[in-house]
Amino acid sequence: MAGIKALISLSFGGAIGLMFLMLGCALPIYNKYWPLFVLFFYILSPIPYCIARRLVDDTDAMSNACKELAIFLTTGIVVSAFGLPIVFARAHLIEWGACALVLTGNTVIFATILGFFLVFGSNDDFSWQQW
């Protein structure tokens, strides 16, 4: 039952984050859809860590380096997702209010992604690795 509550909480968090992103794009005072490019970062952010989890063996000394590289790449993707709306706002492609909404959405979405890996990342019967 705890897994179902976690799954519902994570889906609610994802919906709230996407709502902030859409508000930053679709409100009539902003009406620019450039911030939707951060969706690519949402898709790309878990990929390095997922690949590293599949490839490494915890007993191998190289596994630590592979995991650290995956965390480094994930960090670069997350920082880029936060930097892109700021660059758009500085270049006057979007308004600063839209930038604030997108950054709020980024925070919620990445917290949801982190929560997914914390809840479903263990090696038990209720793990995402079996999907």
Curated annotation (Swiss-Prot):
Functional description taken from the UniProt entry:
Negatively regulates growth hormone (GH) receptor cell surface expression in liver. May play a role in liver resistance to GH during periods of reduced nutrient availability.
How does the annotation summarize its subunit structure? Answer: Interacts with RAB13.
Underlying gene: LEPROTL1
Q: Name one Pfam family in it.
A: Vps55
Tissue specificity annotation = Widely expressed, with highest expression in heart, testis, adrenal gland, thymus, and spleen, and lowest expression in lung and skeletal muscle.
Q: Which organism is it from?
A: Homo sapiens (Human)
- Recorded superkingdom: Eukaryota
Q: Quick check: keyword Transmembrane in the entry? A: yes
Q: Which positions, given as ranges, span the membrane? A: 7-27, 32-52, 69-89, 100-120
Q: Where in the cell is it found?
A: Membrane
Q: Name one GO cellular component term.
A: membrane
Alphabetical UniProt keywords: Membrane, Transmembrane, Transmembrane helix
Q: Per its record, how is this protein called by name? A: Leptin receptor overlapping transcript-like 1
What's this protein's family per the entry? Belongs to the OB-RGRP/VPS55 family.
**Keyword Transmembrane included in the entry's annotation:** yes
Topological relation to the membrane, as annotated = Multi-pass membrane protein
One MF term in the entry's GO annotations: identical protein binding
GO biological process terms, alphabetically, are: late endosome to vacuole transport via multivesicular body sorting pathway; negative regulation of growth hormone receptor signaling pathway
